[in-house]
Amino acid sequence: MDEIQDIEGLTRRALQAISRIDTLRDLTKLKNDNLGSTSWLAKYSASIKILSQEKKPIIGKAVSEARRKILEACQDRDLALRLNAQNEQFTRETLDITALPTRIFPGARHPIHVLQDKILDFFLMRGWSVVEGPELESEWLNFDALNIGPFHPAREESDTIFAEPRSASMLLRTHTSPVQLRALVSNPLPLYCVSSGKVFRSDPLDATHTPVFHQLEGLVCDRNITLGHLKGTVEDLARYLFGAEVNLRMRCNYFPFTEPSAEFDISRDGIDWTEWGGCGLVNSKVLSMAGVDTVHYTGFAFGFGLERTLQFIHSLSDMRDIVEGDIRFSQQFGLK
């Protein structure tokens, strides 16, 4: 029959075309051309109903056989193309362990962390210990135990970030001084320790303020501790950080947790002074809160901000440069 020959011829051409297909997109198009609703096979299928009773089973069988062969060929070719694509991908992604490495541009350590490590090394070399404490602190340790009364302005929500619920009396610490209390309670005397970490204030971010900054504090509790020990420690640290030519002065001030108290300023020329931090002999009330025998033991404490210290070292005018995290800022100091 002519119809059988036509179907077999079209089937052979379709199978030959399928074997030459190189892409899945072309295979999909060819499959639609031969098996789709407007394909030649669809037309032969539609014509079966008008054939004679003798031809219907013969043509129907030929159409079914052609559809089966073409469908199987399309499936086999689809699998082969996908395997080829996968193998090509594996070849592209193969790691040549003998190849020379490409240059990797390293990140840069933030200057604050480098400065922090430098200061901690200063104290570790002198036999001090490094202590740490939580950033989420109790209101009692942050204020009451440091002789900061219930009506002190620092306890207002405009200055301090309290955690919810407010009744829990928990807050983001406003200074690292609570760490000193924890150290006094958990360590035997004499105690020489330093702590550093993030503190939090309700301040806007501008050229001179940031709501999150780094603070470093030192604490000594021993027999016969005097202001002379405090002054000598701060002076040694200043020379270590800023050079032997730096000028340091102390001004009387008031802090609830030290008595007497002072602020210390630094200057390169002895004329323009920059406030650096605060210090004093630890208030006997604070020592008593920690269970220290104030008859036989005294102590001193000091603290300062690392951001302000970094500003003075590198003559930085805008604190926002320090906190924005731009790697180019760190790299300009040669820190990697």
Curated annotation (Swiss-Prot):
InterPro entries with a match to the protein in the record: aa-tRNA-synth_II, aa-tRNA-synth_II/BPL/LPL, Phe-tRNA-synth_IIc_asu, Phe-tRNA_ligase_II_N, Phe_tRNA_ligase_alpha1_bac, Phenylalanyl-tRNA_Synthase, tRNA-bd_arm
CDD domains found in the cross-reference section: PheRS_alpha_core
Binding positions for Mg(2+) per the UniProt entry: E259
Molecular function in Gene Ontology: ATP binding; magnesium ion binding; phenylalanine-tRNA ligase activity; tRNA binding
Record's protein name: Phenylalanine--tRNA ligase alpha subunit
GO (cellular component) term, any one: cytoplasm
Subcellular location, record wording: Cytoplasm
Gene: pheS
Enzyme class: ligase
NCBIfam families the UniProt entry points to: pheS
Pfam families cross-referenced by the UniProt entry: Phe_tRNA-synt_N, tRNA-synt_2d
Cofactor(s) this protein requires: Mg(2+)
Keyword Aminoacyl-tRNA synthetase among UniProt keywords: yes
A GO BP entry: phenylalanyl-tRNA aminoacylation
Assembly notes: Tetramer of two alpha and two beta subunits.
Organism domain of life: Bacteria
Free-text remark on how the cofactor is bound: Binds 2 magnesium ions per tetramer.
EC number: 6.1.1.20
Catalyzed reaction equations: tRNA(Phe) + L-phenylalanine + ATP = L-phenylalanyl-tRNA(Phe) + AMP + diphosphate + H(+)
Family the UniProt entry places it in: Belongs to the class-II aminoacyl-tRNA synthetase family. Phe-tRNA synthetase alpha subunit type 1 subfamily.
Keyword terms: Aminoacyl-tRNA synthetase, ATP-binding, Cytoplasm, Ligase, Magnesium, Metal-binding, Nucleotide-binding, Protein biosynthesis
Organism of derivation: Tropheryma whipplei (strain TW08/27) (Whipple's bacillus)
